[in-house]
Structures are given as structure tokens and as C-alpha cells.
Amino acid sequence: DQTDLDGGLSDSVPMMRAFAKGCDRVVVILSKPRSFVKQPEGFRHIYRHALRKYPQTIAALDNRHLMYRQNIADVKKQESAGKALVFAPSKELKMSTYARDEKLEQELYDLGISDFDARLNELHTFLS
């Protein structure tokens, strides 16, 4: 019996793994604006109970905000060194993980396309 969980629990932005695997440059796509600061997970009492057979998962959830913050610090460092090109939403749209608002989803999609189009030449230069 095997249980699989999202890898984002332990490495939300696996950029350093890409470097360790031999990449010399990476394109990082963030789903939150650069100003986003991840907070500790809510509902600890619920996930501690639900995941009691998986103490390492509980620890990963408990520390996820700290790992994310370190990931973002690493991203900024690599971006400054010219080794990472970072795409992030240019503005914040208030959308929760479990939102089912088609209009808001379309706005977020359109923002991503617009942000990408605005930096397409920069991406070509970075990759060449």
C-alpha cells in the first residue's frame, strides 16, 4: 500500500534540484506575485490527526512556509546572478486554492498570457 503526496510539500520551487541535475539556467514560474509571503499552514490540528501515520509529512507541512521562503530567497539570488528568469503574476488576484470562480480563473489566465507576452523577448534572450 503506497500513498503519494504532492512534491510541493517538501520543495515548492525545485530550482536548486534542477541545478544539481546539471542545468546551468532555469526559468521559474511562480503562481503568486513576488510580494507573496507564505504563512504557516492552517488547520494543523486537522492534518496532524489525518496524517498521524505519516510524521514526516506532518513535519513537512509544519515547515512548508519556511522552506518556501528559503526557496524564494534562492530564486532571487539565482535571478540576480543571471541564472534564473522568473515569471510571476504582475498583480495579485484574490483567488483561493479551492476557488471555483470561472471569471476569476479567466482573469488569472489572461494575466499570465499578458505577462508572458510582455517578456517574450527577454525569455528568448535568456535562453539563447
Predicted regions, residues:
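Patatin-like phospholipase
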Residues: 1-128
